Amino acid sequence: MKRQFALGAFLYLFLVSPSQGGEFDAARRKMVQDVLSDTAVTSSYSGSSALSPGVIAAMEKVERHRFVPADLATVAYLNRPLPIGYGQTISQPFIVALMTELMKVKAGDRVLEIGTGSGYQAVVLAEIAGAVYSIEIIEPLGKQAGDRLKSLGYRNVQTRVGDGYYGWPEAAPFDAIMVTAAASHVPPPLIKQLKPGGRMVIPLGSQFMVQYLMLVEKQQDGSVTNRQILPVRFVPLTGGH
């Protein structure tokens, strides 16, 4: 697996090195094409054969290399997760796009994200939504992400350090909720904070067992439906649960 990664990284650098293309534009375009290809291949699982224009535009615009450690900037646009420290990762771009697509975020929506990480997913959401609220339980990561988002000028994202299992009740209700760590069950506080008609995307399963990305929809009468999307691998959700 390490050898395969090394070869892939070498080819990536050879084909889309910033020194050849000026900045990371070519690498980002290739990443988006890889994401679109994965979307088509997995359409029988996800129900999405294509991404909406808003999601594509966000993926094309947000500069992923600004959200990874400096020594990984040259491989930031590979379509795979990368470590960001503290045992955490920045999600695979395809998964970022798919989760965003599944939530059907619209302009003006209020979105809650559990697991800020580097802040990349929050920024992708912020390109579409009206307001994004993001919670990170690991204090150094949360502070770094908050500073990064401010420096990049994203004023429609609020971050805080805390236990995402309990959500952000004072900012609720939310049109959509995204959980970027695997839980054993859907946290009841998050269901409560989801608007009727809202959508939640969450990976369910333990760290050492099969995990599935789930789409949770809250009906107008308050009832909840779940749909299994596809197998995934996320770091575990920690905290109150």
Residue positions per predicted region:
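Bacterial N-terminal signal peptides that target proteins for export
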Residues: 1-7
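Bacterial N-terminal signal peptides
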Residues: 8-16
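Generic anion/oxyanion-binding catalytic loop in active/binding sites
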Residues: 10, 88, 166
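Short linear Ser/Thr-Pro motifs
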Residues: 15-17, 91, 118, 134
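Class I SAM-dependent transferase core
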Residues: 20-112, 128, 143, 151, ...
